[in-house]
Amino acid sequence: AMCWWGEAYANGLNINAGMSEEQNRMAIFAVKQAERLSANASEIEKALIAAQAARFPDDLSADRMELERQYSAMMVKAAKQFPQSDDLAVLAAESAMNTTPWDYWDPATNEARPQIATAISLIERVIANNPRHPQASHLYIHLMENSPDPKMAEAAADRLVANAPPALGHLVHMPG
């Protein structure tokens, strides 16, 4: 079930790229397979699959950003339900970032947008639990780079330099 979940996840949009109709169709197919195979999945896995199912309904004409907001709400709820899962918290934070790509801070107030404040809180929780979590450090840099105080992510950048395998080019370039 989780292999199919991953297929759906990989076809979804992210902060750097939208998704084509073909990717949407592939994600819909994949999430249906994940649902079909989920009987023996863990509770966390079932929550992840349910969130992806909400993200990729059969209706190709559905408002993509509204679906992303629904997906994010389900992911944040799951992260609160299973606070022991750092990976789930990181995925939930990423889902919140996808609802407002590269527009994380209100320029009038210098405050994080509400869903981004949630993402920051989730990522900071993961970093406190597992400072070497590479995706938590990666996302924290992105969350803070346009904040009023980007130096808040300096320690995360230092950890990426020290711990990211050189083959992970995007992560290795992040601290620069």
Which residue stretches match the model-derived regions?
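Short coil/linker segments at helix-helix boundaries
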Residues: 4-84, 91-128, 132, 137-167, ...
